[in-house]
């Protein structure tokens, strides 16, 4: 196996379980020294269990890699600074940041409490900002000091934010924000030698089984299919690639990944247009026919149900 990350230092948030765990392990397999960040909370963000990160560190060390645990919370600005500083203090630098940490508190909008909204936004969106900010400060300072920089940020968005999903207004809003954040920071950091991309993974984790029991049966059935398309291990190769020097020049992109399938996501763009013949503003009463004609011309939206049907078809293959 060609090792793509020799000499690199990576930080992975939420690396104690699920997708983050597999990302941390494969980054280490490819030669990266890894900061395994995870405070060990429940899927809804309560509690703290340091063994979750410790066990991943031990697994990496047993296979001959280098890793250190960090238990800070990403939604705390100073805590996020300590996460990044752990990489610098322990391994001398940071090359790769994988923003993976997340929780779920799914509720319909009329049942959602302020705390449910605030906490999910804080962990996903603010947490991504916090860690990204501190890493980018370090990279910018390195670049301004004349030192070479080849930074990589891989954020984690979701179809819930790109397509929408009932019961996840907090989570979807955070994930949509992360997609936009990715595009903007990619432009801001390009001149400093940093690329910024995002993945929208679908895999079997606590967040897709324990937190969303309506999906649990479907996801578990795939585990016993001829091809386990929802194994979280399937997500890590894309992260390793985007973290490597081979991905140079690829930035500001969002990729959905499920098993052996990868999509390049297009994002918001105009799909239909109307302009009045006269140079005058629209009148409200004339807009009904105009808007409805435009809607007929627009391509159909993807839905999460369509994606899941494709996943199940591939699993049964």
Regions found by a protein language model. Give the residues of each.
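A glycine-rich helix->loop->beta "capping" turn
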Residues: 63-66, 79, 86-99, 105, ...
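C-terminal helical subdomain
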Residues: 220-316
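Residue(s) in the substrate-gating loop at a strand-loop-helix junction
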Residues: 158
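Canonical Rossmann dinucleotide-binding motif of NAD(H)/NADP(H)-dependent dehydrogenases/reductases
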Residues: 3-36
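Substrate-binding pocket helix/loop in short-chain dehydrogenase/reductase
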Residues: 108-109, 116-121
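Active-site helix of classical SDR
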Residues: 132, 174
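The beta1-alpha1 cofactor-binding region of Rossmann-like NAD(H)/NADP(H)-dependent oxidoreductases
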Residues: 50, 54, 71-84, 114
């Amino acid at each position: 196996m060609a090792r793509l990350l020799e000499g690199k230092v990576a930080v992975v948030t939420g690396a104690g379980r699920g997708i983050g765990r597999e990302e941390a392990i494969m980054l280490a397999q490819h030669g990266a020294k890894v900061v395994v960040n995870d405070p060990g909370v429940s899927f809804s963000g309560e509690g703290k269990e340091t063994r979750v990160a410790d066990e991943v560190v031990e697994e990496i060390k047993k296979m001959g890699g280098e890793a250190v645990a960090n238990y800070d919370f990403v939604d705390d600005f100073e805590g996020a600074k300590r996460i990044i500083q752990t990489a610098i203090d322990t391994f001398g630098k940071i090359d790769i940041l994988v923003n993976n940490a997340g929780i779920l508190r799914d509720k319909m909008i009329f049942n959602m409490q302020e705390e449910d909204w605030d906490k999910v936004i804080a962990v996903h969106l603010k947490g991504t900002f916090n860690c990204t900010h501190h890493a980018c400060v370090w990279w910018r300072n390195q670049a301004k000091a004349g030192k070479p920089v080849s930074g990589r940020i891989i954020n984690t968005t979701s179809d819930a934010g790109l397509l929408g999903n009932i019961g996840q207004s907090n989570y979807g809003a955070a994930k949509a924000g992360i997609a936009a954040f990715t595009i903007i920071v990619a432009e801001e950091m390009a001149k400093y030698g940093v690329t910024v991309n995002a993945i929208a993974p679908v895999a079997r984790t606590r967040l897709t089984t324990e937190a969303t029991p309506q999906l649990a049966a479907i996801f578990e059935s795939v585990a016993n299919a001829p091809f386990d398309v929802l194994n979280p291990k399937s997500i890590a190769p894309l992260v390793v690639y985007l973290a490597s020097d081979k991905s140079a020049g690829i930035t500001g992109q969002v990729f959905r990944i499920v098993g052996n399938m990868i999509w390049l996501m297009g994002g918001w763009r105009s799909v239909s247009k109307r302009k009045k013949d006269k140079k005058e503003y629209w009148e409200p009463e004339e807009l009904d026919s105009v808007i409805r004609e435009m809607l007929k011309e627009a391509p159909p939206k993807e839905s999460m149900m369509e994606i899941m049907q494709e996943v199940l078809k591939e699993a049964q293959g």
